[in-house]
């Protein structure tokens, strides 16, 4: 008899309140299949890596990840071990005996899940035979020249083979397999074609054709129902990939997407409405001290300021304490990531700040990897000059301090001319002379290979943001991922984000958007759009996102020019906030991190697993979903105090007066508001299982 206990699952929106018997994981095996298991390529790696702990806590030794084998990743990320589960051990042994190379171990991340990794190159001799199998299964042919698709065919064929071996030795256990993206979809197609007794889930994080069409500057969302899908895929030479993706979607027992906006897209592009929307989460780590993340912001901001001192040597005519650090990061997709609208908004922001004679300087970083051949010599020289000046200042300070100390011991007020001798003055004059330069600070930190056609640099030339002294907006393109070993900006991405004031991600195509979510978890305000999954999620579940530091640009129902004006308004309003207002806003932003915790969002994956088991094994698992209650779902409430946002409590000048701060002291109590927010979010959610009590059922599972 299956054991179970009740689990209270409450909707963040869309999913009704429902109480079910917990799945008997002792009698189940869960496999998640993705090309990015131990293999960092894009955002799916983050999804799987961060979700692993929550899933491993729930499923224990019966949870396995399947991915490709790469020697470097295996050495650095995986600890090899022998499979404990008998069915998995037999499957691995059987495949190795038949000429495959299957590696098994624990992934060295939180949760330490088991991983099964297939060596693609070792099994490439089967490629032609497996192409025939795929053609017989779904009449999809793969061109010889498409190396990536051929690799996916090998990976999918090995996955289906492995799952067959597992089910042959499962000894009555039921198998659930979740496949992420089209790269893993061939394994699903072949498993279903061979009628393997497994419950399948297919999750799309973005549609193939959607990404291609949006990159071509097409008005995608207003023409979703007008595209000739086959024609568009054929013109872009991805028809076979599109067919694999669509076949995977229609073969799966349950189809899921990561956001509502992607669900709409998938319904039109792939011709199936998703059964469940599974938002992406993060592992949220709370600090023991309430304001520790504020201290980290100050510490890492100082390190960014050091870089700016070197990069802008000879042109440091602005106050670093009145400088705001903004950034955009991600793949180099100029239009999809919104770099085009961001640059245009920066041009307009520069005009506004100059027109109002603001003393605020905005420093904008573009962290987008592109093709480079080396560091920019001027940038390297700037950091060398900065370090030289620091050494000179430190040397003079030591001598100055010793002479001052001796004079005070003698009871004398020293003459500065006596303390600073001629050698010191000469050294300082040489140091000052070394900071002089005729050229402007470089816009990019590296030498770009195609700088004449680079979209970001071409736009910068058009709008004229060349880091002139008169510009209030300065731009720095860092065409490389951040690293703590870099000689220019030795910081990891997380450290850099914590040191910035605002992340700007005005994406046109963003199925979820981990970058603004990561900002939120770290207490950094961000700009997103209503075309990103994250933006739609926050718009749905937070009554006043702007008050909590989530600025949502309307890119769906406004023209590009209107969207650009709205973004400019957000940026200008942010520049007008006082330091205190920004601190209050960061506190509120960090409190939203509970909404993005996998402990909450993991329930959507639980629901998908229940659903697929009920469809694959209706005699064993059954679910009767009744109509959800008539409710609009939970909304994180607006702060009780006046929100320190451009729309609600911005100062009329770049800096607020002391009197204004005193007034804010009276109406804002950080601890009281934080406690109210904690109660608000915990009342509709439950982090732990609810062992007792029966509620009105909105879904019931029977054995």
Curated annotation (Swiss-Prot):
Alpha-D-glucose 6-phosphate binds at residues 291-292, 294, 297, 301, 501, 582, 586. It comes from the Eukaryota. UDP-alpha-D-glucose binds at residues 205, 211, 331, 510, 512-513. SUPFAM superfamilies: UDP-Glycosyltransferase/glycogen phosphorylase. Allosteric activation by glucose-6-phosphate. Phosphorylation reduces the activity towards UDP-glucose. When in the non-phosphorylated state, glycogen synthase does not require glucose-6-phosphate as an allosteric activator; when phosphorylated it does. Residues 658-674 have a biased composition (Acidic residues). One of its GO terms (cellular component) is cytosol. Gene3D superfamilies: Glycogen Phosphorylase B. One of its GO terms (molecular function) is alpha-1,4-glucan glucosyltransferase (UDP-glucose donor) activity. Specifically expressed in liver (at protein level). GO terms for biological process: glycogen biosynthetic process; response to glucose. Optimum temperature is 30-40 degrees Celsius. It catalyses: [(1->4)-alpha-D-glucosyl](n) + UDP-alpha-D-glucose = [(1->4)-alpha-D-glucosyl](n+1) + UDP + H(+). The keyword Iron-sulfur does not apply. Glycogen synthase participates in the glycogen biosynthetic process along with glycogenin and glycogen branching enzyme. Extends the primer composed of a few glucose units formed by glycogenin by adding new glucose units to it. In this context, glycogen synthase transfers the glycosyl residue from UDP-Glc to the non-reducing end of alpha-1,4-glucan. Belongs to the glycosyltransferase 3 family. Part of the glycogen synthase (GS)-glycogenin complex, a heterooctamer composed of a tetramer of GS and 2 dimers of glycogenin, where each GS protomer binds to one glycogenin subunit (via glycogenin C-terminus); the GS tetramer may dissociate from glycogenin dimers to continue glycogen polymerization on its own. May also form a heterooctamer complex with GYG1 (via GYG1 C-terminus). PANTHER family: GLYCOGEN [STARCH] SYNTHASE, LIVER (PTHR10176:SF1), GLYCOGEN SYNTHASE (PTHR10176). This is Glycogen [starch] synthase, liver. It comes from Homo sapiens (Human). The lineage of its organism: Eukaryota, Metazoa, Chordata, Craniata, Vertebrata.
